[in-house]
Regions:
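Rossmann-like dinucleotide-binding core of oxidoreductases
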Residues: 4-44, 49, 97, 138-140, ...
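N-terminal glycine-rich dinucleotide-binding loop that anchors FAD/FMN and/or NAD(P) in oxidoreductases
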Residues: 52-80, 232-240
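Glycine/threonine-rich phosphate-binding loop and adjacent beta-strand/alpha-helix elements that clamp
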Residues: 67, 336-413
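Short glycine/proline-rich turn/loop motifs
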Residues: 73-82, 276-280, 383-390
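Feature captures the FAD/FMN-dependent oxidoreductase FAD-binding
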Residues: 84-149, 299, 313
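C-terminal, flexible cofactor-proximal segment of oxidoreductases
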Residues: 111, 218-222, 383-541
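Glycine-rich, aromatic-lined ligand/substrate-binding cores of catalytic
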Residues: 293-298, 302-304, 309-311, 315-342
């Protein structure tokens, strides 16, 4: 059993001042670490901090969160009641700045600083963090490093035959800033993703014609369902049941998920077969979904045209699609094809390709980072945490950021140090995980190679953080919670899945928040009020 030790004097560099970086800074400093954030932007917020710099991924001024304020937030800092159910980019920015100010984090953030490389120093005792501050190169040494610079940093863009001869403009959604740049143009979007749902409605208002090219169908969810935010359909109990099914009955879970999603999609009304939205859509368990209800409206109104996947460029301004259709007057092609994490500043991270016994089961994806629990490089688990490679691992936006930061702090302080096995054990676990990734890739080759097993990933981090959620389980602790406080037991199991629950139970591993109980009750009351208001509106109609 590992022993707890004081981290006083240990320096930590945190890369990135988005929600995860801010949570990490607050937690580490509260636990005694001398932590500092290095952020390339001029303010906190990560991608929620709008920037004109086209090399950075940013939420646009019209971007609206996909997750409601009721389930998205920090564990000890509630969102103000006056915010709407779904926050805008500026409101998220405002909230994150208020969080930073409230907890006195600003004094420990170095802005306008880009980290260019992280490597071990000459005597292998510390990390050398190379950075550029105000255009000047600087190198500083730290005991530990946490990478929170996001998994949406590098734009992914396909290449097509004849692309170099295209006489129009080809760009990625990452570069999009001003919709007026496309006034009077014919524009093709490649990919039907969350970024497309942000950009397409803006371009439609200015362009002459807009086409959306997609090779296959996609699952489209609206933010609202029966008058309530869609994310409120999931509560703690349903999530745990889902994890159980995914873990023990993955094929059945995938089939049931597809059936349920198809049912929900059809609730949006008639879907024109020519849109191909339900045609060969990738399994939900292997790909993330998008809130794209606005896209459905644009399709119905004829303001955008659904096209098959791009096959090639034919010279001039011609684009050929996989069904043989050719459009010969396209001014701009915008790739909405996603992002990948940037490992270029972390040259020490090892990558490998899963071995396959059978050729027909061969993994053909890119080499996968070798990280235990998709966080810790085995040789440096005691001093390096990489939080840019855990796709599907988080629930409810950045509400999980506090769980991750508490877990890492506890592991490094020795409070949960026994949860990190030996290097050989970590290597074996990584090999097994990569085989799981390979199996997913064979079924769906667009799946993210940084995916995690949610049930395994979250169980590990909750235990390391000491959130005490085992008190909501089906064991004796769960029954004891119900007997002592049936109201809270019911609200946390079947009510709104709030972040405050992560600081409700006393476990001795992390600080509880005295306001957690009231915040959980208040959030559920707000949702109950919202439901009543929506019901009243429906009756009036």
């Amino acid at each position: 059993m590992a022993t707890s030790h004081s981290p006083t004097g240990q320096t930590v560099a945190i890369i990135g001042a988005g929600p995860t970086g801010l949570s990490m800074l607050k937690t580490l400093r509260n636990d005694g670490f001398d932590a500092t954030i290095f952020e390339r932007r001029s303010r906190v917020g990560g991608l929620w901090s709008y920037t004109e710099d086209e090399t950075m991924t940013t939420a646009l001024p019209n971007t609206t969160a996909n997750i409601s304020k009721y389930t998205c937030g920090f564990t000890d800092y509630p969102m103000p009641d006056h915010y709407p159910p779904f926050l805008s980019q500026s409101q998220f920015q405002e909230f994150l700045e208020s969080y930073s100010t409230h907890f006195g984090l600003q004094d420990h953030i170095v802005f306008r600083t880009s980290v260019t490389e992280v490597e071990r120093n000459v005597d292998n005792t510390k990390w050398c963090v190379k950075m550029t501050t105000e255009g000047k190169p600087v190198t500083r040494e730290f005991d530990k490093v946490v990478c929170c610079h996001g998994y949406q940093t590098q734009a992914k863009a396909p290449t097509f035959p004849g692309q170099e001869e295209f006489q129009g403009r080809i760009m990625h959604a990452q570069q999009f800033r001003r919709p007026t740049d496309f006034k009077g143009q014919n524009v093709v979007f490649v990919g039907m993703s969350s970024s497309a749902s942000d950009v397409v409605p803006l371009v439609v208002q200015n362009a002459a014609k807009v086409y959306v090219s997609h090779r296959r169908g996609t699952w489209i969810f609206g933010r609202w369902r029966n008058g309530l935010p869609t994310d409120l359909l999931v509560n703690y109990t349903r999530r745990q049941m889902g994890y159980f099914m995914q873990s023990w009955f993955p094929d059945l879970s995938a089939k049931l998920s597809k059936m349920a999603t198809t049912f929900l999609m059809k609730k949006y009304g008639n879907l024109d077969p020519s849109w191909r939205l339900l045609e060969d859509a990738p399994p939900l368990s292997l790909n993330l979904t998008a809130c794209m209800d606005t896209m459905l409206d644009l399709l119905r109104e004829g303001k955008i045209t659904s096209m098959h996947g791009v096959e090639s460029f034919l010279g001039g301004k011609k684009v050929k699609f996989m069904d043989g259709t050719v459009l010969d007057d396209i001014d701009t092609v915008i790739f909405c094809t996603g992002y990948r994490a940037d490992f270029s500043i972390l040259p020490f991270v090892e990558h490998s390709t899963p071995e396959n016994d059978a050729q027909d089961n061969a993994f053909g994806g890119a080499p996968i980072p070798r990280l235990y629990m998709n966080i810790f490089p085995p040789k440096h688990a005691e001093s390096m945490a990489i939080l840019i490679a855990s796709t599907y691992g988080k629930n409810n936006g950045f509400s999980f950021a506090d769980v991750i930061s508490m877990a890492i702090s506890n592991i490094w302080r020795g409070v949960s140090g026994d949860m990190i096995p030996s290097v050989p054990e970590m290597e074996r676990a990584i090999d097994a995980h990569h085989q799981w990734i390979a199996g997913r890739w064979v079924k769906e080759n667009t799946t993210d190679v940084c995916a995690v097993k949610q049930w395994e990933f979250q169980r590990f981090l909750h235990e390391a953080a000491g959130t005490g959620l085992e008190n909501l389980g089906w064991g004796w602790k769960g029954w004891w919670t119900w007997l002592r406080d049936p109201k809270m037991s019911y609200l946390m199991r079947h009510g709104v899945e709030t972040a405050y629950a992560f600081r409700y139970f006393e476990t001795g591993k992390r600080a509880v928040w005295p306001g957690a109980r009231d915040a959980i009750i208040h959030t559920n009351a707000l949702v109950k009020k919202l439901r009543a208001e929506k019901l009243a509106e429906t009756k009036k109609e």
